[in-house]
From Swiss-Prot:
Protein name: Methylenetetrahydrofolate--tRNA-(uracil-5-)-methyltransferase TrmFO
SUPFAM superfamilies per the UniProt record, alphabetical: FAD/NAD(P)-binding domain
GO biological process: tRNA methylation; tRNA wobble uridine modification
Catalytic reaction equation(s): uridine(54) in tRNA + (6R)-5,10-methylene-5,6,7,8-tetrahydrofolate + NADH + H(+) = 5-methyluridine(54) in tRNA + (6S)-5,6,7,8-tetrahydrofolate + NAD(+); uridine(54) in tRNA + (6R)-5,10-methylene-5,6,7,8-tetrahydrofolate + NADPH + H(+) = 5-methyluridine(54) in tRNA + (6S)-5,6,7,8-tetrahydrofolate + NADP(+)
Cellular-component GO terms for this entry: cytosol
Source species: Synechococcus sp. (strain WH7803)
Any single Pfam family the record assigns to this protein: GIDA
Obligatory cofactor(s): FAD
Chief localization: cytoplasm
GO molecular function, one term: flavin adenine dinucleotide binding
Length: 451
C-alpha cells in the first residue's frame, strides 16, 4: 500500500483482515505535503465532514453501503462523530489517531515511513493510494508509466477558530431547518455588512502558489475558494455557503410568524461547524481560501461575531493531482496495462472522503483476492460504490473531471417517481438490496472493527 490516507488506510485494513501481510508506505513525517499537519493515518486535510448522514442522500447512501461492507474508516467515523446537524462530522484529531493506532497494532500491518519515489516491482500486488497530494517524484514516475500527463485542480481548506472567542451576543446556535440539535454557530449579516465583506474579499491579497494562475486555474466546483465565489457575482455567496434560508435566531421572534420572518431574516449567514468532541474548535463552513494569512484574519474578523476570533489554523490552497482514470483503470480499480497494480481514493478521480474510502475498500478487497488467486470483483452499478467505480472507468476521456457521489450516476428506476424524496428513497432501497445480494454471493464485508 502506497499512502496512508483514507483510501490507503481502508485498503490496508481489508487486506490485513483477509489474513495477508501488508506493507504500508507513508512519506509523512519524513516529507510533508502542502496541506497535511500530522503524520497520522487518514488525516482529514479539508473539512471534518463526510457529508449528509441520511441514506436518502447520495453521500449518506455511500456511507451506509460502506458500513454494511465492514469499512473500518466509516465505523471509526461513527465512533468519533461530533454534532453536525444532518451530517457525519468527526473530531479529526482523535479520529486519525485511533485509526493510526489500529493499524500500528495490527499484527499483519508493517509501516514504512519513507517517500516512495517510483512504482514497485511488477511482480508485487500494489495499491496506489497516494491521494491528490502525490509527491512530485512519484507523480513523474506515474507519468512515465501511463504515458499521460496527470490531471489536476486546485483545492483549499477552511480556517478554524476557538469557540470561546466567538461573540455569542451577535451569533446564535441553530441547525438549518432545525434538523437535529442546534449544532452550528451562525453569524448573521445584514446587506451592508455582506457587501462590505465581499468587497474586502475581492481586494484581499492572495498567497503565492506554485503553478497557480488565477486567470487559468481549474477548481473543483463543489469546493470553490470563498474569494472565487465572491468574484463570480454579488449574490453567489448568498446562494452558496452564506445562504440564510432555514436559519433562525429565537431572539428574532416567533419563527412561525411569516411577517416576523420576512422582516427579521438575515441577509446572509456564515456558519461554523464543530471540529472536536469538546466543542473548543470550530471551522468556517465553505470558507476554503488562498488568501494570505494576515489577510484572512483581517477580512474574516469583519464577520459579525468573529471580530475577536482566535484562529488556530488558517486556510491553505494546494494542487490536487488525479489520473485520467477512464483511459487507465477498470471498474475493479486495476490498471489495464498492469492488473496487479490498483489505484484507490481521490487520485482515481472520485471526490469526497466517503468516495475515497469506497475506493480503498474495493482496491483492498481486490488486492487480497489477487494474492489468493481469486477473480477481482466490482459491485453492481445500482449501488453507489459500484456506480462511482464504473463511472471513473467508463467516462469519456479527454475532459474527465472528479466526480462526487450523486444519484445521477445510478441507473434509472423502472418506474418514474416524481417526488424527489420518494425517488431518492427508492434508489436507496434498491442499492441496499442489491448490495446485500452481492455480499451474499461473494461473501463480502461485515468485518467489525475492534473496540
Amino acid at each position: 500500500m502506497i499512502g496512508a490516507g483514507l483510501a490507503g488506510t481502508e485498503a490496508a485494513w481489508q487486506v490485513a483482515e483477509a489474513g495477508l501481510d501488508v506493507q504500508l508506505v507513508e512519506m509523512r513525517p519524513i516529507r510533508r505535503s502542502p496541506a497535511h499537519h500530522s503524520s497520522e493515518c487518514a488525516e482529514l486535510v479539508c473539512s471534518n465532514s463526510f457529508g449528509a448522514l441520511s441514506s436518502d442522500r447520495a453521500a449518506g447512501l455511500l456511507q451506509e453501503e460502506l458500513r454494511r461492507l465492514g469499512s473500518v474508516v466509516i465505523q471509526m467515523a461513527d465512533r468519533h462523530a461530533v454534532p453536525a446537524g444532518g451530517a457525519l462530522a468527526v473530531d479529526r484529531g482523535r479520529y486519525s489517531a485511533s485509526l493510526t493506532q489500529l493499524l500500528e497494532q495490527h499484527p499483519r500491518v508493517s509501516f514504512v515511513r519513507e517517500e516512495q519515489i517510483a512504482l514497485p516491482a511488477t511482480d508485487q500486488v500494489t495499491v496506489l493510494a497516494t491521494g491528490p497530494l502525490t509527491s512530485d517524484a512519484l507523480a513523474e514516475d506515474l507519468r512515465r508509466f501511463t504515458g499521460r500527463a496527470d490531471c489536476h485542480f486546485f483545492d483549499a481548506a477552511s480556517p478554524i477558530v476557538e469557540g470561546d472567542s466567538v461573540d455569542m451576543t451577535q451569533a446564535f446556535r441553530a441547525s438549518r431547518y432545525d434538523k437535529g440539535d442546534a449544532d452550528y454557530i451562525n453569524c448573521p449579516m445584514n446587506r451592508e455588512q455582506y457587501l462590505g465583506f465581499r468587497d474586502a474579499l475581492l481586494a484581499a491579497e492572495q498567497a503565492e502558489l506554485k503553478d497557480f494562475d488565477q486567470g487559468n486555474a481549474t477548481f473543483f466546483e463543489g469546493c470553490l475558494p470563498i474569494e472565487e465565489l465572491a468574484r463570480r457575482g454579488e449574490d453567489t455567496m448568498r446562494y452558496g455557503p452564506l445562504k440564510p434560508i432555514g436559519l433562525w435566531d429565537p431572539r428574532w421572534g416567533d419563527v412561525n410568524d411569516r411577517d416576523v420572518r420576512r422582516a427579521k431574516r438575515a441577509y446572509a449567514v456564515v456558519q461554523l461547524r464543530q471540529e472536536d468532541k469538546d466543542g473548543r474548535l470550530w471551522n468556517l463552513v465553505g470558507f476554503q481560501t488562498n488568501l494570505k494569512w494576515g489577510e484572512q484574519k483581517r477580512v474574516l474578523q469583519m464577520i459579525p461575531g468573529l471580530e475577536g476570533a482566535e484562529f488556530v489554523r488558517f486556510g491553505v490552497m494546494h494542487r490536487n493531482t488525479f489520473l485520467e482514470a477512464p483511459a487507465l483503470l477498470d471498474a475493479t480499480l486495476q490498471f489495464r496495462s498492469r492488473p496487479n497494480l490498483l489505484a484507490a481514493g481521490q487520485i482515481t478521480g472520485t471526490e469526497g472522503y466517503a468516495a475515497a474510502v469506497a475506493g480503498g475498500w474495493l482496491a483492498g478487497t481486490n488486492a487480497a483476492r489477487l494474492v489468493r488467486g481469486e477473480r477481482p470483483i466490482d459491485l453492481p452499478r445500482t449501488t453507489m460504490v459500484g456506480a462511482l467505480t464504473h463511472f471513473i472507468s467508463e467516462a469519456p476521456s479527454g475532459k474527465f473531471q472528479p466526480m462526487p457521489p450523486n444519484f445521477g450516476l445510478l441507473p434509472e428506476l423502472p418506474e418514474r417517481i416524481r417526488d424527489k424524496r420518494a425517488r431518492y428513497g427508492a434508489y436507496r432501497d434498491r442499492a441496499l438490496a442489491d448490495l446485500l445480494l452481492a455480499r451474499e454471493e461473494q461473501a463480502l464485508g461485515n468485518v467489525p472493527c475492534p473496540a
